[in-house]
């Protein structure tokens, strides 16, 4: 089947319209073959862009419905994409990528002035929303570990298997599905920037100068991102997850979270800076080890571990926490 015929057949099955969510029975997400969509088709998917799901550095995200499945449609600002021809080529490459910790890219729109990406819809928002208490719940320590392990596995796959950078690792780009499985978003935009000709393609990316608290000093000195830059960003996200503190707070002794944590750890206050909403309901050894991992990721570039190492060590943290939970269950059973 040609792409055009496949596209027509695909769109003949659309369940899109002006109906309210309550009138639509959504089906569990399954992989939809990727295609190129026209702007008119994207307009239909999003019901004329009437439901804004969120806003990010690349553009506005809208909710839509495609074949009884919810999808997220990111309308991109063309100014944010360095090379449209290269971008289109890479989108074709990325629609083939399937990893449980990466948001699935369904397709794209490149129609006149309109540029968009279509993704699977992820139900539980992003990590930033969850940590902020927006939904009224507090993530347990075990759940936080599982989430950050998912992020680490997604980055490990990007670095080791695809040999590309993510470049935008931050809580707003870590989405959580109905089971709170972490899925990295926006990785498909990582290669739409010029690469350094002196390195392997995609292993080093030039980024316009600017201040971003998730990027390391190496970037600020050179404006080039490397795998260690992603690892630094990951470490900062981990520190946020552990402490539930903002990345930058000018009222702190040291405004940036990495420096602030270093100061507190030097004082011996490791557990004192853990998110108080956890109410000390965690295995201390697991938290301390996780803090060490986060700090090593945020250390100087040549001292940072690989994501493969991080995955191994984080699973050890999870094993420690699970052992505590099992032990506590045993104690309750004996008491009864």
Language-model regions: role of each:
Residues 2-336:
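Conserved eukaryotic protein kinase-like
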């Amino acid at each position: 089947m040609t792409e055009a015929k496949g596209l027509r057949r695909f769109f003949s099955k659309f369940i899109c319209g002006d109906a309210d969510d309550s009138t639509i029975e959504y089906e569990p997400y399954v992989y939809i073959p990727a295609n190129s969509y026209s702007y008119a088709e994207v307009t239909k998917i999003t019901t004329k862009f009437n439901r804004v799901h969120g806003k990010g550095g690349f553009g506005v995200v809208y909710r839509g419905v495609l074949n009884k499945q919810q999808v997220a449609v990111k309308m991109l600002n063309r100014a944010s994409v360095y090379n449209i021809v290269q971008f289109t080529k890479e989108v074709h490459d990325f629609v083939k990528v399937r990893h449980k910790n990466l948001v699935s890219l369904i397709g794209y729109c490149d129609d006149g002035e309109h540029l968009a990406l279509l993704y699977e819809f992820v139900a539980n928002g992003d990590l930033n929303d969850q940590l902020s208490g927006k939904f009224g719940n507090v993530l347990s320590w075990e759940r936080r570990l599982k989430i950050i392990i998912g992020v680490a596995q997604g980055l490990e796959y990007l670095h080791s298997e695809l040999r590309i950078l993510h470049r935008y690792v931050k809580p707003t780009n870590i989405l959580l599905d109905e089971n709170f499985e972490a899925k990295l978003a926006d990785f498909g935009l990582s290669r739409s920037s010029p690469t350094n000709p002196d390195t392997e393609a995609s292993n080093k990316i030039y980024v316009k100068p600017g201040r971003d608290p998730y990027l390391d000093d190496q970037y600020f000195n050179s404006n080039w991102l490397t795998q260690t830059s992603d690892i630094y960003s990951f470490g900062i996200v981990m520190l946020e997850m552990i402490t539930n503190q903002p990345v930058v707070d000018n009222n702190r002794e040291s405004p940036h979270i990495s420096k602030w944590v270093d100061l507190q750890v030097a004082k011996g206050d490791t557990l004192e800076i853990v998110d108080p909403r956890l109410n000390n309901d965690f295995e201390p050894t697991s938290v301390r080890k996780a803090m060490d991992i986060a700090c090593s990721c945020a250390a100087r570039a040549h001292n940072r571990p690989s994501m493969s190492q991080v995955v191994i060590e984080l699973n050890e943290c999870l094993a420690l926490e699970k052992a505590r939970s099992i032990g506590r269950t045993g104690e309750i059973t004996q008491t009864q």
